[in-house]
Amino acid sequence: MGFRSLSPYVWPIYGPWMASSLGMSILLVALPIVLVGDGHGYTVAALVAGAGGAGAALAALPVGWCTDRWGPARVGAGALLAVIAASILMASMARPVFLGLGHLVFGGGSLGVMLSRQADLTRRIPITLRGRAMSLMGGTMRFSVLMGTAVGGFLVDVAGARWTFLIAGVGAAIGLPAVLPGVRNPDWEIAPVGVKGPRMAWVIRANKRHLLHAGLFGMSSMTTREGRMVLLPLVGVALDLRPATIGVLVASGYAADLILFPVSGAIMDRVGRLAAMVPAYGLLAVGLLCLLVADTATGVLLAGLVMGLGNGLSAGSLFTLSSDLAPEEGTASFLSAVSMVTDVGRVIGPLLVGLVAGRWGLDAAAVTLAVAMMLGLVWLSAVVGETGGRTGDRP
């Protein structure tokens, strides 16, 4: 079995996740540019940018509970509608407090789409194909992020902030037709178990060791990934680059991501999870340290490419790790608990960048993110270990 066997899932599973990622990535580039350009400081820009991660963390447990009971399609449809409403709010009232609130809801909705798709896919795909299935999930996200980051700065330049926020919502809305058949025919789905399914508290207690294993590494890596998304635009602003140029610099790293995601899945399935993850996340840390000597657009581009190589080789790794450790009963609830811990990093990353950069500068922020990633790699290698062969090692 290979990537071709995943073709039936491209539209119903990967399509909605790709659509919501497109909208989210437009916002991640546009928000720091808009806020700093309007005279707000790094801290305000980082707080608003981090609100998306906060929304994802807050939504994680409710989304898992709902998915186990009502099914991935209904949850995915509701999440996409929330994303559309959030974009309308941001376009209507473009003040920092409303941008933060809208981004909070947008982040929660994107998390709902992701978890509902992952829960469905986890139950359908055998472990021997899981690395490639989840790397394709990461790869489709990277393709949408590449598109979003490439046009995010351009849209701010050409259309202005309000239209950019609306377009982010329209991008997410593309995924709605993919989940509607499942809403009309819940019997097509595998994941929903109804009201007799396990309680969230029971799932967490019974799987707390695996929850900490996957969640803490996910939090470390997400801190670095999300911090990078805020740091690179701020470095571009510090170099007096145009918003469109900043968008291209950020997108260049995602081009490398997109090329390498099939390699990530093949290595995870054929060699092992650690063989793909340790070198990949190590490159992400190295790329951040390269920013210390980058004082031109070319230097930032090269650093972004190194980070992109690492991020591409890690495509789908967090999805794979959590799916490897997920129990048969209460799969969506477990995945949502892991996601909640992981998404704390989505809040910490932008906040670290804003607070450290505001006090000690952007170089210090880059070092801080690199250290966070290295600590995560120590945890992964020394504590978590290889998960690809744990089909029978579940509590």
PLM features: residue spans?
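Residue-level signature of mid-helix packing/kink "hotspots" within the transmembrane helices
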Residues: 53-61, 145-146, 254-262, 346-347
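C-terminal membrane-cytosol helix-exit motif in multi-pass small-molecule transporters
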Residues: 170-191, 376-384
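Helix-to-loop junctions at the C-terminal end of transmembrane segments
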Residues: 59-71, 260-272
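Helix-loop boundary and gating motifs at the non-cytosolic
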Residues: 6-53, 211-217, 221-235, 239
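Cytoplasmic helix-loop-helix junction between adjacent transmembrane helices
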Residues: 104-141
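Juxtamembrane intracellular "pre-TM" segments in multi-pass secondary transporters
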Residues: 1-7, 184-214
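Paired small-residue
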Residues: 97-105, 298-306
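Structural signature of the two symmetry-related core transmembrane helices
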Residues: 74-88, 169, 275-289
